[in-house]
């Protein structure tokens, strides 16, 4: 299914976002607004969620030239300039960080196996939590060198901390 508007077809970049939840949708929207790629593909185990998110974002593409937002599958990773993994479950009340890590590591390992079926030497950005552990899992499963697997690290925690401090000061 193709969604979005292309005003002029020229291949700049394709970015695949795996995980069409709140974080994945926000990242795809930001990529569209900043025109970081002219082909943004959302991949999710829940294809309807990915289609809906792609449509929501694509409705704004008429304000930005050369941006195409759509839902797709892992085969889209074959020629992507970057793959961003945002998939994973959110931490539930009472759930330990270790339990979250076990679940999300399992999820990103499966995602990485699917990515590597199609992509030869991808650049992967891991945003799933806990970021350091999931990034290491992606690197181990993919066999990619460290410079091809980038984790968001504690950037989100730092941003949250800065926000809380600004509210208190």
Question: Where are the model-predicted features located?
Answer:
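Conserved N-terminal Rossmann-fold NAD(P) cofactor-binding segment
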Residues: 43-81, 95
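Rossmann-fold dinucleotide-binding core
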Residues: 87, 126-169
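A short, basic/flexible loop-to-alpha-helix module at the beginning of a structural domain
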Residues: 2-13
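Rossmann-fold NAD(P)-binding glycine/threonine-rich loop
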Residues: 94-145
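N-terminal Rossmann-fold NAD(P) dinucleotide-binding loop
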Residues: 24-25
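Aromatic pocket-lining residues of Rossmann-like dinucleotide-binding sites
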Residues: 31
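Glycine-rich Rossmann-fold phosphate-binding loop(s) that bind the pyrophosphate
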Residues: 20-21
